[in-house]
Amino acid sequence: MGLHSTADAAAIRASIRSGAFGGHTSGMAPGKLQCNLAILPAAHALDFLRFCQRNPKPCPVVGVSETGDPMLPTLGVDIDIRTDVPRYRIFRDGVLTGEVTDIRDLWTDDLVSVALGCSFTFENALVRAGIPVRHIEDGVNVPMFRTNIPLVPAGPFNGHMVVTMRPIPEAMVDKAHGISARFPQAHGAPIATGDPRALGIADLAKPDYGDAVAVKPGEVPVFWACGVTPQNVLRDARLPLCITHSPGHMLISDVAEDAETPIYQS
């Protein structure tokens, strides 16, 4: 891809900004907090933040911009939310109208950006502990699934949780649980382990987003809350305009993955 996965966050963002890199960000910038993204009109921002507060597992807020300001200085010195995400999704009245790599022509002075922690953040800790992460090994995006788990509504925002799935060796499930629990700003501990049917998932080979990965003998499917959840909720709210990241294509911040608070300090 022309950009090494261990490059620092600023170098990766610069490559994204220039158009040189536009792929998924799983496994990139080890040690840094990766973020899901929601951009919406200020008139709906408070209701959306209420929704996130009521559903912290799938929606851990780590950054909020000033109204109309595309910069996110609390997450990094040079982050421009209009250019620094590899791929964006554009929704108008609840309809996905396209995916783009730059939203400067869509930016207006009434938009608010909300960054939410991503489970890609704790994957580096799993790998360091010797726990295999299949989609990183395979070089693909993490599989994501819609579930039957209801969310707590706020204003026009409501829906069901989306989860990521990682096959974990059965003997390592407790270890993976304990490690990810140390990252509440990145969805924290798993929400379920084992039978996907209990979550309303019919077939692990057919993810709703991302790429399918094999669950090998001796492995157990483990499910974490996922930041595509608020993306679906925003779509279903049918706002005149909202912008999100494309699944798997995250904002990479300068905040340490294990920071007690998601505030960048130079």
Swiss-Prot record:
Official protein name in the record: Putative hydro-lyase Jann_2570
EC number(s) given by UniProt: 4.2.1.-
SUPFAM superfamilies assigned to the protein according to its UniProt record, in alphabetical order: PSTPO5379-like
NCBIfam families the record matches: PRK05463.1
Native source organism of the sequence: Jannaschia sp. (strain CCS1)
InterPro entries documented for this protein: D-Glu_cyclase (IPR009906), Putative_hydro-lyase (IPR038021), UPF0317 (IPR016938)
Alphabetic keyword roster: Lyase
Family, similarity comment: Belongs to the D-glutamate cyclase family.
GO molecular function: lyase activity
EC class of the enzyme, as a word: lyase
